[in-house]
Curated annotation (Swiss-Prot):
This is Putative glutamate--cysteine ligase 2. It comes from Burkholderia multivorans (strain ATCC 17616 / 249). GO terms for biological process: modified amino acid biosynthetic process. It comes from the Bacteria. ATP-dependent carboxylate-amine ligase which exhibits weak glutamate--cysteine ligase activity.
Amino acid sequence: MALETFVNSEPFTFGVELEIQVVNTHNYDLTKAASDLMRLIQGETFPGNITPEITESMIELSTGICHTHEQALGELHAIRDVLVKAADQLNVGLAGGGTHAFQQWSDRQIYDAPRFQYLSELYGYLAKQFTVFGQHVHIGCPDPDSALFLLHSMSRFIPHFIALSASSPFVQNVDTGFHSARLNSVFAFPLSGRAPFALTWHDFEEYFTKMVNTGVVNSMKDFYWDIRPKPGYGTIEVRVMDTPLSVDRAAAIACYIQTLARYLLIDRPLTLTEDDYLVYTFNRFEACRFGLEGTCVNPQTGERRTIAEDILDTLDRIAPHAAELGSRAALDEIGALAKARVNDASWLRTVFKQEKSLNETVRQQCLRWRE
């Protein structure tokens, strides 16, 4: 199969996708209600889209093409409200968070759709274990070479996105010690990690053709990279974030990525080399394990600083672009998180410490989602 033609899109437009937990209101375990939710929202009017995901305990919402923080926030609130109304009719709850705190993966039921059934047959139990919940952000790119430049430039900031969105400290009744345990599930897949270092679309097409010829992949969907190009949309897709506990946080993170993209493509502050990836896995691990307190290493200078410090420095550098995009309010929220060095994982641990119950913690997650 040939690689899709890259459809040039309006630079720095963006879209947000959020995978949501569907839980019962008895003990707040995951429940099988995605099909019923899809049935109830038929005929409802809302921006963007709502689609099923790989198991019956997940559902995905996505915005349309957004230009500003205000637009994204409005669309996310509108879609969220439609889903909450349907969930209330079914007496089920909805929650953000990258993992469910105590669900047992073996209880999951694969959603009845051809691609999901194919993935279940291919990956076995990994497909059910993949009941984890992420935020994806698409960024519009003017041409395919710019998309690849942005992809590799953005890779240096992957620890920021992980630490800011981290909301998965608990897995199967255990505090994992991680801020984002979700990404450990993603790493189990053979085509995860980072994209190959190709800076021209011609080189990327050659790589894709070789992979197709091996029989390992059929389409871009088979790559689970942290950032991947989406030729049919004319975007790059940043895929490392946990689903935050609120749509407000999701919008702020999306606009941080949008503003950073404008800075990277217009100012071109980075000279890209494959050596940029020498510390990629280390920095990624630090963000997953320690959140905003984690260490990140500059691959060119060797300088070490906390991820929170690196975010605050980055916010200063991209401030002029925030003014152009109307994203100052979003970046103020990001700055406040970095200064306080807290994220949703911190909040979840605080609730559990107070309540001594993961069931109650998930109940409060559901309340956060409605705010």
